[in-house]
Amino acid sequence: MTSLDVLINKATDPTLTSDNWQYILDVCDRISADPETETKRTITILKTKLTSKDANVVLRSLSLLISIAENCGSRVKQEIATKSFLQDALVKRLSDKKLHATVKYKICEVLTQLYNAFKGDPSLKPMTDAYNKARSEHPRYFSKQTQGPSKPAKKERTQQDKDREEDELQRALKLSLQEFEQQKTGKKEPDVNKPLPEIQPEPESPPVETVATVSKVRALYDLVSYEPDELSFRKGDVITVIESVYRDWWRGSLPSGKIGIFPLNYVTPIVNKSPQDIAKEIEIENKLITEEQRKIERLLAILSSQQIETINEDEVTHLYNEIIPLRIQLGNSIDKYGARQEELKVLNQSLNSEIKLYNELLDKSISSRAKHNTGGAMYQMSPYPTEQFPGQSQPQLSQQQQHQPYAQPQQTSNYAQQSQTVPPQFTQSQQTQPQYHQSHTRTGSHQEVPQYSGYNSNNIPPPATTFNQYPPSQLQQQDTSAGFGNDVYNRAAPGQPY
């Protein structure tokens, strides 16, 4: 690959979103340095670029063609004004149905510019012939009116605009209330003798088109935008209106699911069909499905018959003439339901994604709540630590806790002993008892009765206890060996077993 190929590839790179004039001038300088050898090579490369399927490459190549035609001398003009180059690279591209309309407008613009530059030289007559042929075969691409208008500026809605709309709304509501009050009050009897005034026809003001009154619009022109927030569409596309973003820009979505903003001068509102039009359309579709379908099936059956001598040519001609006009109706119905199918697919995808997101959030909420409840239940199951001694069952421990309301015996274990605070009244009468393999029960005189294995202490109720010797301030909260307050004193009435 020569240096010229590298320069042309850089100037026509498909990743370029606009013309890079530094690369274009580099190509012009390279051709001007050696026009004898580089001119024909450049036109050959450009011919390949102009027939590319990439619209971006074609647009960049057209800009490069204009630049070298105006800056690289007469030799380049002679190579451009050849019938093979003009027909294959420019004129024939206007008939390509797969080529975007924006590229066709650009080709016609280049042809016009080259024609104006070459028309003074009789030796460049093929350029004039190519221009006249393209203009006669494709006149719509030479008219600038068919191109979309310039996009309006994105002006933010000021606070004054919002206040003005609010004032107009309040004024309309006030007038509506006044008319309602006038109709509600008694009407005056009309004067019969008074002549009636002539009715003056009021000019009908066109309805104001707002987001509230317009739900769908149809594109009048093609719009190709490279801005990330703008919506690109083709002529005839139906856009669903979402909201008003700027003064002359709305946000909408295509049936394919693309969302973006678009200028209002590129679209026109779609008028909702009346009930009569909808009923007529349904009637035509039902007729196509019932009556016309049988005719189509009859014609197909006749044409697929193997017995050619039995075919009635008059019947075939009659059926064919009746079916041919139905192509437009069938095409419209196919387009209508095809667009509706695309809309439903997009809605289904959006709904599935929202349902998936909702289920994920719901699962996270349930799992976090379950963890929280499990932690709370574990905390409630063990409010204070208990220890089971060898040879002693758990019910005996519960009985021991039940029959020791004043203070629990000090428990020895491998861990550090817990400190306890004993009231002064207990220091003289209450002694620390050694821990055996049996539990103890205190009586009213603080005497210990041993409870051995198999002995049921529930058969003997505890005696009554007098609390007069303990001050109330010290009975409200006493620390036990387990480290928890024995607030059972507050709930037990004096003289009652607890």
Swiss-Prot record:
Subunit structure: Component of the ESCRT-0 complex composed of HSE1 and VPS27.
Stored CDD domains: GAT_Hse1, VHS_HSE1
GO molecular function, one term: ubiquitin binding
Lineage, top ranks: Eukaryota, Fungi, Dikarya, Ascomycota, Saccharomycotina
Domain named SH3: residues: 212-272
This protein's name: Class E vacuolar protein-sorting machinery protein HSE1
Keyword Transport in annotation: yes
Segments of this protein annotated with the region Disordered: 136-210, 374-498
Gene field: HSE1
Residue stretches of biased makeup (Low complexity): 388-438
Bias (Basic and acidic residues) ranges: 153-163, 181-192
Residue ranges annotated for the VHS domain, each copy included: 11-142
Family: Belongs to the STAM family.
Taxonomy, superkingdom: Eukaryota
BP GO terms, sorted: ATP export; filamentous growth; microautophagy; positive regulation of protein maturation; protein secretion; protein targeting to vacuole; protein transport to vacuole involved in ubiquitin-dependent protein catabolic process via the multivesicular body sorting pathway
Key words, A-Z: Endosome, Membrane, Protein transport, SH3 domain, Transport
Transmembrane segments: none
Subcellular localization, as worded in the UniProt entry: Endosome membrane
Functional summary from the UniProt entry: Component of the ESCRT-0 complex which is the sorting receptor for ubiquitinated cargo proteins at the multivesicular body (MVB).
Membrane topology: Peripheral membrane protein
